[in-house]
Amino acid sequence: SHKEYRKTLSELRRRINIVERLMSENRWDEIEFDKIPSRAGFIYKNAFARRDIIAKKYEKFAKDTTKSVNASVLYPYEVVAKAVKGCDYWGNSSMSDVDRAMINKYWANLPDYLNGKDCSMMCVVDTSGSMTGSEASAPMNVAISLGMYCAERIGGPFQSLY
């Protein structure tokens, strides 16, 4: 029945310590940032920063270079969209140091979409006005992220050339 399904689901969520459950029960201090799903980390970052009980822990985690985040279900364009959102037309950033550190963590922990292949390629990125859009998946965000991702992760003569 529907009632049994909801009870089973609730029990399973309790056992795996799902972040939304901890948040709704005001158990903020029990949240472990290196264990939460990547999408949840993206969605709830403002909630973490607003709560005094966890804001300092979140800031410490963001600045700790030895700890990583789960970015297994994020695409590069989603990370770029968050970074671009914090900048104005001239590239001036209104982003906090904590947000910048977390975006860098997500970028560094993106999956290997190139499957470890060492190829000789160069990405040419179109950033003309026709590439703009209002969503995270705007063509410009996709193009920039693809160019950056490939330039950082490929080998060969074009590695790290932007």
Each PLM stretch: what is its role?
Residues S1-V142, E152-Y162:
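Long lumenal/extracellular ectodomains of secretory and single-pass membrane proteins
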